[in-house]
Amino acid sequence: MKQILFMDTTLRDGEQSPGVNLNEQEKLQIARQLERLGIHVMEAGFAAASEGDFQSVKRIANTIQNATVMSLARAKESDIRRAYEAVKGAVSPRLHVFLATSDIHMKYKLCMSKEDVLDSIYRSVTLGKSLFPTVQFSAEDATRTARDFLAEAVEVAIRAGANVINIPDTVGYTNPEEYYALFKYLQESVPSYEKAIFSCHCHDDLGMAVANSLAAVEGGALQVEGTINGIGERAGNAALEEVAVALHIRKDFYKAEPSMTLKEIKATSTLVSRLTGMVVPKNKAIVGANAFAHESGIHQDGVLKEVTTYEIIEPALVGESQNLFVLGKHSGRHAFTEKMKELGYEFTNDERDAVFEAFKKLADRKKEITEEDLRALMLGEAAFAAQQYNITQLQVHFVSNSTQCATVVLKDEEGNVFEDAATGSGSIEAIYNAIQRILGLECELADYRIQSITQGQDALAHVHVELKEGAHQVSGFGVAQDVLEASARAYVHAAGKLKSFIQLVK
């Protein structure tokens, strides 16, 4: 049975989702979780896009030990050399070079002839191969490219040294029958077909990204590209968790097995959702809150008698926790550390002490600590540690029926303390006005969302905010048992990002 490899582009294509803005620390968190998920290749970013992207890609490349780290690059020497500088320290570095091959892209975007495109493919892949052990070439807009020219372009790339050939459905245009046929056509029409691994990359504009990816596997693709939760440009990408579980459950049909640690799916989905602020729909396959819920009386009766009557996926397969109570206020440092290791977290002694202290504070207020609480705790403490400013004091006073006053004290990385107060029509508005006064910002609150992480009156709150000032928009999140504290943390997280970004642009 053939093994299907997964190339995750959450950190590159996924981050292009409108409103998503991840900092370096957040990208590293996701990269480490993707490593635990067993992703074969992770596209860490587009190193030539900006200095920030370059540094993020470089840090991920120097950190990840058990996956290939790849950078995107245009078919330009400067891009390719910049990508090399970013990922050369990786255990397994890879270049991902792309060039459009469809008539519409060649005519209107590239202003290049077919001969020029073929020459550029050959030169860029050849250069890449002189620097990288593995080169992937993508024929952008492949599904709207003339088949004979696509086959010619692919052959040129393989002869130049490309190890992986990606056939992307860049605008989500194709359907499963067409995509399957395209892979079969290339298998028959590319003389050097056997010298490369073929990959698929599907967008969801017509809602067929997962179906098209599975059709590509039927057609001979050995690598599937996509993102966690299907996030990405426009309508998003193929959701890798859906493709992987479909291959596993229906291996009788696809004759293929996903190369992925399926039990890490839920944790990965949750992390990506909380860091990006993109809420997973309740009815989403595999990772939605209702994925394993049964409300119909007939269905409930059937499941109670025999679970397979209405449930084809065991929740534990994808890491859906059935074990609620894990730790409490009497748990010691050793038990806490071992439990965190079990969940896949490793940290230095200083990091452990900080997180354990946060755990003890939470345990004093919360009767039961669940795995979701622990993951949220790690998420919140990581964001807290990465912030330029941290909240040391927060007070809200009732002034009148329509006005409240908030006093906020912040401390920066150098230990400088800033304090101010402001009023607002509610507690949160007053807090946000005070923070704006301290940081000297005049930004607009573009989005505010609150989500309960666990059940019960003592549940942790996760707040996501998006701030906008002029053309700049950033997001931030905060986790705390108190909604006002979580809201303040989220605002400080985002405001610190916005202030840094504005200073960088200036």
Curated annotation (Swiss-Prot):
Cofactor(s) listed: Mn(2+)
Subcellular location: Cytoplasm
Keywords attached to this entry: Amino-acid biosynthesis, Branched-chain amino acid biosynthesis, Cytoplasm, Leucine biosynthesis, Manganese, Metal-binding, Transferase
A Pfam family matched in the record: HMGL-like
Protein name per UniProt: 2-isopropylmalate synthase
GO molecular function terms attached to this record: 2-isopropylmalate synthase activity; acetyl-CoA C-acetyltransferase activity; manganese ion binding
Gene that specifies this protein: leuA
Family per similarity comment: Belongs to the alpha-IPM synthase/homocitrate synthase family. LeuA type 1 subfamily.
EC number, UniProt record: 2.3.3.13
Known partners and oligomeric status: Homodimer.
Record PROSITE patterns: AIPM_HOMOCIT_SYNTH_1, AIPM_HOMOCIT_SYNTH_2, PYR_CT
GO biological process, one term: L-leucine biosynthetic process
Enzyme class label: transferase
HAMAP family, A to Z: LeuA_type1 (MF_01025)
Protein's job: Catalyzes the condensation of the acetyl group of acetyl-CoA with 3-methyl-2-oxobutanoate (2-ketoisovalerate) to form 3-carboxy-3-hydroxy-4-methylpentanoate (2-isopropylmalate).
Annotated catalysed reactions: 3-methyl-2-oxobutanoate + acetyl-CoA + H2O = (2S)-2-isopropylmalate + CoA + H(+)
CDD domains xref list: DRE_TIM_IPMS
InterPro entries: 2-IPM_HCS-like, 2-isopropylmalate_synth_dimer, AIPM/Hcit_synth_CS, Aldolase_TIM, LeuA/HCS_post-cat, LeuA_allosteric_dom_sf, LeuA_bact_synth, PYR_CT
Ranges where the Pyruvate carboxyltransferase domain occurs: 4-266
